[in-house]
């Protein structure tokens, strides 16, 4: 397997997540969920800025007008970077105060797919929602525990999804026009010693790059054969998500976490919570934006 080199950004997130590449700003965004922080890192200048919110901030992605779309606790909002104005768009599970949003992505039609979990990680307490132009969340999957990574194939016929504790990446038939999904098969089974699958993205060859929580790296899986192709080894245990970006879409930004590490482990793995940049030999696709 290839050996990768990385550079790190000293973010020191408690729970770094949701990397997103903004083409117009030529910068990476990510969040520190529990601390409500939004990071922006300009790739050319190397400058990082941080904005803080009085909520758990679980997701950042792009809106159709250049604004950001944020998931805060159980609500979705648009955020104007120039005015710093936050506008609430929709909400889920107001009857479940222990729940919060987690990972999310937009499909090729601009619909937002976003999951929930219980902050107590209660089995079966999470769901996956689809949010379209009418801003009404529609439940697509339930009985989830940690709704997590998602990706679509280039032909928009397959949707990949991770419910982390299952240690599986599931493939669903995807109907682009309607946004309907139907379970097809388990594409990848992840063995215990490799940790838990967390966030993921897909490259132009259709391979899945998956952050392994407790697995010290990002693993590249072939979802057709279920085989592990390669691994980006990182000097931290808890790797949480990854996204392609950069001018050639060949730079992988990887988020990590300090949570669930003891003081001794944090001394042993001092870069835990930092963000890593890795140049790959493949490319990703520009992320879809939320159309509403």
Tell me the role of every PLM-derived stretch.
Residues 4-10, 46-52, 87-94, 136-142, ...:
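A short beta-strand motif characteristic of beta-propeller blades
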Residues 85-142:
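Hydrophobic alpha-helical segments and helix pairs
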Residues 172-180, 223, 280-285:
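Short loop/turn segments immediately following beta-strands, especially the blade-tip
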Residues 243-292:
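Blade-level signature of beta-propeller repeat domains, shared across WD40, Kelch, NHL, RCC1
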């Amino acid at each position: 397997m290839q050996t990768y080199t990385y550079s790190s950004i000293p973010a020191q997130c408690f729970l770094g997540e949701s990397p997103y590449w903004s083409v117009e700003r030529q910068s990476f965004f990510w969040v520190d969920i529990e601390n409500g922080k939004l990071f922006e890192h300009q790739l050319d200048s190397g400058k990082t800025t941080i904005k803080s919110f009085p909520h758990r901030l679980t997701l950042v992605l792009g809106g159709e007008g250049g604004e950001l779309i944020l998931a805060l606790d159980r609500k979705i909002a648009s955020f104007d970077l120039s005015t710093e104005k936050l506008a609430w768009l929709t909400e889920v599970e107001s009857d479940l105060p222990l729940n919060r949003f987690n990972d999310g992505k937009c499909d090729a039609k601009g619909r937002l797919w976003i999951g929930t979990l219980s902050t107590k990680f209660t089995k079966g307490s999470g769901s996956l929602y689809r949010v379209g132009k009418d801003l009404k969340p529609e439940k697509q999957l339930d009985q989830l525990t940690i709704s997590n990574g998602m990706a679509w194939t280039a032909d928009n016929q397959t949707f990949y999804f991770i419910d982390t504790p299952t240690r599986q990446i599931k493939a669903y038939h995807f109907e682009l026009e309607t946004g309907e999904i139907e379970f097809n098969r388990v594409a990848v089974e992840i063995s215990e010693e490799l940790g838990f699958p967390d966030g993921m993205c897909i490259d132009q060859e259709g391979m899945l790059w998956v952050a392994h929580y407790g697995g010290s790296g990002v693993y590249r899986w072939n979802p057709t054969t279920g085989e592990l192709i390669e691994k980006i080894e990182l000097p931290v245990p808890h790797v949480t998500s990854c996204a392609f970006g950069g001018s050639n879409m060949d730079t992988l930004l990887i988020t990590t976490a300090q949570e669930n590490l003891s003081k001794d482990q944090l001394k042993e793995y001092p870069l835990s919570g930092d963000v890593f940049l890795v140049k790959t030999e493949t490319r990703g696709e520009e992320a879809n934006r939320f159309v509403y």
